[in-house]
Amino acid sequence: MTENRRMKKVNAMLRESIAKVILKDVKHPKISNRWITITRVSLSRDLQSARVYVSIMPHENSQEETLAALKASAGFIACQASKDVVLKYFPDLNFYMEDIFSPQDHIESLLLKIAEQDKKLTHNNNNSSELHD
């Protein structure tokens, strides 16, 4: 139980530190000025590697390009984050996309379709009532 609690604490510290590094220190053009959220970090049991799950707000550059830039900058990000989170061995960072924006976009498009259908039905009902008058 204590190991689980310790692991959660280390994951949270890594998440916060990696987010700070990406926000303040990374100068890659496909990373800086992007809305990147570190949704969670999952450290391996041997503490040698960490899965870093990110959510990237859609932008003119594709999310895949931004993810590729994060992967390319993983060494730099780990080096900078290791100054903040002191561990015996700092884990290798592996970035993965966690798409939290798609469900919202999908719901928004469904609502727009419903609104369009409602307009059509209202328009058709108005036309049919005019014919009967």
From Swiss-Prot:
* Keyword Cytoplasm set for record: yes
GO BP annotations listed: maturation of SSU-rRNA
Superkingdom of origin organism? Bacteria
> Where exactly are the transmembrane stretches of this chain?
none
Listed A to Z, the keywords are:
Cytoplasm, Ribosome biogenesis
Q: Name one GO cellular component term.
A: cytosol
Q: Which InterPro entries match?
A: KH_dom-like_a/b, RbfA, RbfA_dom_sf
UniProt subcellular location: Cytoplasm
Kindly list the GO molecular function terms attached to this UniProt entry.
Answer: ribosomal small subunit binding
What's the chief localization of this chain? Answer: cytoplasm
Q: What does this protein do?
A: One of several proteins that assist in the late maturation steps of the functional core of the 30S ribosomal subunit. Associates with free 30S ribosomal subunits (but not with 30S subunits that are part of 70S ribosomes or polysomes). Required for efficient processing of 16S rRNA. May interact with the 5'-terminal helix region of 16S rRNA.
Assembly, in brief, is: Monomer. Binds 30S ribosomal subunits, but not 50S ribosomal subunits or 70S ribosomes.
**Family designation:** Belongs to the RbfA family.
PANTHER family reported in the protein's UniProt record: RIBOSOME-BINDING FACTOR A, CHLOROPLASTIC-RELATED
**Name of this protein:** Ribosome-binding factor A
- What gene is behind this protein? rbfA
